[in-house]
Amino acid sequence: MSTNGHDPHPESTKDKVLVPEELRPRVPKAMSVAASDSGAGAGIQSDLKTFAAHGVYGTTAIVAITAQSTKGVYAIAEVPDEVIVAQIDMMMEDIGADAAKTGMLSSALIVEVVADRLGAWGVPTVVDPVMISKSGDQLLQRNAVNAVKRHLIPMSRIVTPNIPEAEVLSGRTILTEDDLREAARAIHALGTEWVLIKGGHRTATATDVLFDGVEFIEMPSERIQSLNIHGTGCTLSAAITANLALGMAMVPAVEAAKSYLTGAIRAGYAIGGGHSPVNHFYRFPEMGPSAAQGTSDGARAISTTDGDR
């Protein structure tokens, strides 16, 4: 008790005013189920920054911890499956999510656990089938590919592979436009609603293709060389997730996400000695050194897979 007669906890006084629940502003919410990147350029950290930049409240379920920098991935420690389940269930039970995304899920067990819980909660899910990092490090165990195809893709709203990932998921080599479309059909047949194959790994063009099972929508991009390419795949899928949480339909959600990524790459920071990260907050010049760069979403399009991951 206070010796001077004053309440030491003024927040507990009777004159405290509580805002009624119905008057509190509703905030769109999104969940990222992925790995932690100690360099903060990709993974959970990148997803949270992307959500925040879109005005979306982000929650997480961390499935692995990586020792990672702009130069590569040096160690991976998986989180026990019961802890992954607890993270997803506790967040969904309390906070909920208008949309979710998956990133690096390194093992078949983790893939199955995540697919089961997100499917049980019925949250619209963006599946970013992360397999290999930009530095060439294997992030998805080879025996986990079938789990992705059998468990994760069927419960997803959209799958966002780059060319190498699309080849693995479809079992097809992609050299031509026809190859890409056949791969999209094969991936769509696994049970997802939409497929976005990111074309930046093709040398001749940098056209992303969005497919809903009926119509192919080509999204051409100008290929721009940049060192700020770490985490671009994570950022794109997180931006799509944020836009879905905001209530956007799929086509405009993807278009807006591509535009956001363009600006984030152009305003990227010079950080580290490898592939530098993008600037997730380029729209807010007061938050970083990009104020003088004059970046905007009106900038020319950029391939969403130049430096994917």
Functional labels for PLM-detected ranges:
Residues 33-39, 216-230:
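Short pre-catalytic strand/loop immediately N-terminal to key active-site residues, enriched for Gly-Thr
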Residues 4, 27, 78, 251-309:
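Charged C-terminal helix
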Residues 45, 50, 167-168, 226-250:
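Short, small-residue alpha-helix embedded
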Residues 142-216:
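Conserved phosphate/ATP/ADP-binding segment of small-molecule kinases
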